[in-house]
Structures are given as structure tokens and as C-alpha cells.
């Protein structure tokens, strides 16, 4: 998650993939192979663990086989672009869900609408992922891995500060109050801080701040992803609360310059009272650490999450569409979702399986799974250039809102809209 959030611009991708031409196909493939088939699959390192578990389980129980190649996250988009330009894509490839619309519009994925329609649980697939994998009413991808933003709180620090360790924040205002209490009661020696965030990381801001906007009933863009609403309430209300936390020194001192790689590293050390975190980090926390998990809320309540992670599709140049679909559809099955994903405390791609024999052992996991149906994944054709790029306009706006001159927000918001419309 941390490397994904740092993000890279995808201008080069669009230039390279323009050589591919054509649409996403109609669900057919070239001459299919007879007998057992070995298909190729690419994924980025950020989702290596989940991908390897799925492939291992499939290969051990099927005649067809999947050959998985894991590519360094920072090299993944250029690698996909180069392969697309040379018409040498693998049979199956996963992608950061945020960038799926770009791949789909370039014709890199096969149209699998009819195949998805035949799934008995087609209406139970992670809605945000399915939305971004749909173009002009046709569907091209399935959810692969999911990573959600939630609030973690350290129960031991809460108890030491005189807070109820079993009651995390239900509103962003409560979040701020509890973080401030932690800072006031425990932060005098500089080893403990109320909260933390990635203050110099565009992807970190969208992942952790935007859910508060959605929870309050607002939006950060129009539905087409071409107009920014980040200079309006409730976004400005969210910025104000976080700015007050920073001004009161209730935030770890390195937050202002945190570019993403280490923003989740302070909480597991027991140094932070309460903060937004990726759901995937829950299983990585120290075993003896008492952690509460609660949905991200708006200033006065509500709940939402940023539904991140990767979607997966069949390449439009595959010669093994049927074999590829056999694998992809299996990854959505009860067996794969429960015995592979849930068993390892991963977030499930199907909302009807959110409570299962493994997740029920940990109420926090049940809660995280339940948010898949409530969260959002923002759509914008130029998301990477605008929001993830460290030189993009979003990071400038967010930093002025928190650390600088908030009166500049209308001007900087216009720059975001300009970038979205280029």
C-alpha cells in the first residue's frame, strides 16, 4: 500500500499504449489450446503475497496452471505499457484499481461482461472495483485484492491517557479530541503522539482524508472525474480539523515531510494514539498489541472508506481466454475467497462472504469486510497525474490547506480541475 500510494504519473502509459489500438474485444480469443493449459499472469509486488497464495491454491487443484510473474511496483506501469505496445501482454494481469479505467480505455482488457453475468454472485462483487472496471456498460475486470482505509487506535495508550480503550472515535471531531488527549497526557517526552498522516504524499491524503468527505455525504469530484470539489465543504471542514491537530502539535513531527514510504511505520511501534491506516496492515501488527479498528467518519459522523487494491482482467491479446476465465472465476469462488483470502485475514472481494468462519474469529476483520459495500473508489481518467504525482496540483492544495495559506484553495482547486480536463 505504501508504495502504491506514492504513485507515478501515467502519461507515458497513454503514449505507449496508443500503439495497441482497438477495443477490448468481445470475449472471444484466438484458437484455444486443447488439453491442459498454462496461462501467464502478471501482478505488481504490492499484491505479491495474495496473488501467490491464489495461484498456489489453484495450481494444486486444477489441471490448468498459472505461471505468475511479480514485477516491482514502481516498474509495473511502464512494463504493462511496453508489453501492450508490442502486443505481448500476459493472458491475465492485475492493476491498481485507480488505473483500470486507463487500461480499459486503451483496449488492454477483454470484454468479460457475459461471463460475469453468468456468475451466481455477480451482484455481490465489490461494487467500487466493478464500477471502475466498467466502460460504456461493458465489464472488463474483477476484484483481485482489496485494501481499505480505516482508523486504528492503540488501546494501551488510550487507557494510559484516561480514555475508554474499548471506544474509538465515531466522528472526525471525536478523533481529534482523542488524539489531542493522547498528546496532552502522554506526549510530553516526545515519544508518543496523538496521531499521524502522510503530509507530503498525495496518495496518502486521498486514501485517508477523502473517506471523511464521503462519510459526510459529500464528493471530491463530479461523477465524470473532470471537476474538482476540493475547495468546498465537507472537504474544507476535514482539512480544518486536521490543520488544528497539526497546529496543536498533536501530530508526529515528521508528518509534514512524510512522502509515503514510512507513514504507517509509527503506529506498530506504539508511538501513535489513533490514526488512519490501510486495512492490510492489521495482520502485520505486533501480536501482543491491543488495537481497535473503526470506520473513518465525517466531522459529525457517518462512515466510509477508500476501497483500494487491485482489479484483474484478461488481456485483449490472449489466446487462452477460456483458461484465463477459469482461473479468474475460481478466485471469486467460495473456496478461494474463504479458504485462501479469509484464512489469511485478507479483505474479501464478495460482500456476501464478509462474515465467515475465519473472519468471525476477529470482529475487526468482519467490520473491515463490511465496509467494502459502503466505501468508494474515485474515478478520474487523469487520476495519476492529478492526485498521485508529487508534482501534481492536488498535493499543493492539500499542503496549503494543512500547513500553508488556506485562502489559496479556490485557485489551487481550479488547477486540479484543469489537470483533470487536460
Predicted regions and their residues:
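C-terminal lobe and pocket-closing loops
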Residues: 279-288, 299-396
